[in-house]
Swiss-Prot record:
This is Prephenate dehydrogenase. GO terms for biological process: tyrosine biosynthetic process. Residues 300-371 form the ACT domain. Its EC number is 1.3.1.12. GO terms for molecular function: NAD+ binding; prephenate dehydrogenase (NAD+) activity; prephenate dehydrogenase (NADP+) activity. It comes from Bacillus subtilis (strain 168). InterPro entries: 6-PGluconate_DH-like_C_sf (IPR008927), ACT-like_dom_sf (IPR045865), ACT_dom (IPR002912), NAD(P)-bd_dom_sf (IPR036291), PDH_C (IPR046825), PDH_N (IPR046826), Preph/Arog_dehydrog (IPR050812), Prephen_DH (IPR003099). Belongs to the prephenate/arogenate dehydrogenase family. SUPFAM superfamilies: 6-phosphogluconate dehydrogenase C-terminal domain-like, ACT-like, NAD(P)-binding Rossmann-fold domains. Residues 6-295 form the Prephenate/arogenate dehydrogenase domain. The lineage of its organism: Bacteria, Bacillati, Bacillota, Bacilli, Bacillales. It catalyses: prephenate + NAD(+) = 3-(4-hydroxyphenyl)pyruvate + CO2 + NADH. Gene3D superfamilies: 3.30.70.260, 6-phosphogluconate dehydrogenase C-terminal like domain, NAD(P)-binding Rossmann-like Domain.
Length: 371
């Protein structure tokens, strides 16, 4: 029975599930994690990398061995698995959680179909990466990130505390809220911004016939502010459909906002135009800089360097000597409102700060942030 108590079934062996597993292993080395994934390649990799200890033959066969179930799959598949659990006939108690980006539909369904001996705590670790797959999993992925917990109507407080203890190796900041509040907050700061980014890209694409140079000049700041439009189309289709009501509310607000600024422009209302941008600037400048949020952060450093051969290799050699890893490096051709022509992206703010100090000390180039 003790073996079952210390066994966790992880369904979904991608970046998020794999990172949770590594964090649990770090803090609870006695736990046994068995895994299952729709991709045999991911399951084999997870076992080889030590992310899991064993593979399950099926979802339900894995649940039969475990006391805790972590469902790290898209929301649609999570709902399918909850239904399988409801009809499994498994008699022992279970602690169940998920990692989905929307919570109301999942938590409501869990309340509806699961027996009381199965305690479900909705979960949403608000951190990610620009990489995917179990090979990109890191035990520190959620460090200092918000990890939202959304208990259901039938969830005991003890189950929430039990889950927090299991996940404390993530070093995340746990925040409890209702599923409805979660979906409202994320619709504002994550879901709707993805729609806006995608719509800006569509607008640019449609403008190419009229302005053929649009694509070339969009390589600078425009590309930066629309980065999130490169996210998984399938994932964002599902997120919007599962958070439909909140998203429709955001559309209504956005239409009112656009109508307002359009009126200011139409009427050449300089005072209100200034106030509009000043209010936005002040609010954005007051947002936390170092707290991880719902959208993966980009830790970019801009380096003002002369345009001559060998500059990029000089910079990368400095960083390599200090063992500072970079995720991307590129030259910015369109530099309106951006200081510097070389942009280097890092995995963390600490790496960016170290790089800034090294470059300014050893190469005497001026560096800037555009946060």
């Amino acid at each position: 029975m003790n073996q079952m108590k210390d066994t966790i079934l992880l369904a979904g062996l991608g970046l998020i599930g794999g990172s949770i597993a590594l964090a649990i292993k770090k803090n609870h080395p006695g736990k046994r994690i068995i895994g299952i994934d729709i991709s045999d390649e991911q399951a084999v990799a997870a076992l080889k990398l030590g992310v899991i200890d064993d593979r399950a033959d099926s979802f339900i066969s894995g649940v039969k061995e475990a006391a805790t179930v972590i469902i790290a799959t898209p929301v649609e598949q999570t709902l399918v698995m909850l239904e399988e659990l409801a009809h499994s006939g498994i008699e022992h108690e279970l602690l169940i959680t998920d990692v989905g980006s929307t919570k109301q539909k999942v938590v409501d369904y869990a309340d509806q179909v699961l027996p009381s001996r199965y305690q479900f705590v909705g979960g949403h670790p608000m951190a990610g990466s620009h990489k995917s797959g179990v090979a990109a999993a890191k035990e520190f992925l959620f460090e200092n990130a918000f990890y939202i917990l959304t208990p259901g109507q039938k969830t005991d407080k003890q189950a929430v505390e039990q889950l927090k203890n299991l996940l404390k190796g993530t070093n995340a900041h746990f925040v409890e809220m209702s599923p409805e509040e979660h979906d409202g907050v994320t619709s504002v700061i994550s879901h709707f911004p993805h729609i806006v980014a995608a719509s800006l890209v569509h607008q640019t694409h449609h403008s190419e016939n009229l302005y053929p140079l649009v694509k070339r000049f969009a390589a600078g700041g425009f590309r930066d502010i629309t980065r999130i439009a490169s996210s998984s189309p399938a994932m964002w289709r599902d997120i919007l459909l599962h958070n439909k009501d909140k998203i429709l509310d955001r559309f209504d607000e956005w239409i009112r906002e656009i109508d307002k600024i359009r009126t200011y422009v139409e009427q050449e209302d300089a005072e209100n135009l200034f106030r509009y941008f000043k209010t936005a600037k002040d609010y954005r400048d007051g947002l936390p800089l170092r707290q991880k949020g719902a959208i993966p952060a980009f830790y970019d450093l801009y380096v003002d360097v002369p345009d001559h051969p060998g500059v990029i290799s000089e910079i990368t050699a400095i960083l390599a000597a200090e063992r500072i890893s970079i995720t991307n490096i590129r030259i910015i051709e369109t530099r309106e409102d951006i200081n510097g022509i070389l942009r280097i992206s890092f995995q963390s703010d600490d790496d960016r700060k170290r790089a800034e100090q090294c470059i300014e000390a050893r190469a005497e180039y001026e560096t800037f942030y555009a946060d």
